[in-house]
From Swiss-Prot:
Catalytic activity: a 2-oxocarboxylate + H(+) = an aldehyde + CO2
Co-factor remark: Binds 1 metal ion per subunit.
Lineage top rank: taxon: Eukaryota
Protein name stated in the entry: Pyruvate decarboxylase 2
Name of the encoding gene: PDC2
Lineage: Eukaryota, Viridiplantae, Streptophyta, Embryophyta, Tracheophyta
Cofactor(s) annotated in UniProt: a metal cation; thiamine diphosphate
Entries under PANTHER family matching the protein: PYRUVATE DECARBOXYLASE (PTHR43452), PYRUVATE DECARBOXYLASE 2 (PTHR43452:SF6)
């Protein structure tokens, strides 16, 4: 079994948005699976999949663990940009508050 790489793609910097939102957090989303395919240029054993549902993830894993097990497997998991935990939201608020304080005099 070769490696399976998972890239969790939420389309941006969700953590940074929770700390301090701004236009600098809007980024161009890359075609990560296309990038992997470009790197191996058809000359290596490589399997890529872009999944958006649990069913698609199951299918990709079955391929990665089955017929593509001898390949480098790259699975991009697309999640909603606002898919975040309550704990992350609370942490972001605390960091944002700390960032807005004046500097500590030395």
């Amino acid at each position: 079994q070769n490696s399976i790489i998972f890239l969790i793609n939420n389309g941006g910097y969700t953590i940074e948005v929770e700390i301090h939102d701004g236009p600098y957090n809007v980024i161009k989303n890359w075609n990560y699976t296309g990038l992997v395919e470009a790197f191996h240029n058809g000359e290596g054993a490589c399997y890529t999949a872009k999944v958006r549902t649990e069913e698609e993830l199951t299918e990709a894993l079955e391929a990665a663990l089955g017929p593509k097990k001898d390949c480098l497997c790259f699975i991009e998991v697309i999640v909603h940009k606002d898919d975040t935990s309550k704990e992350l939201l609370e942490w972001g608020s605390r960091v944002s508050a700390a960032n807005s304080r004046p500097p500590n005099p030395q």
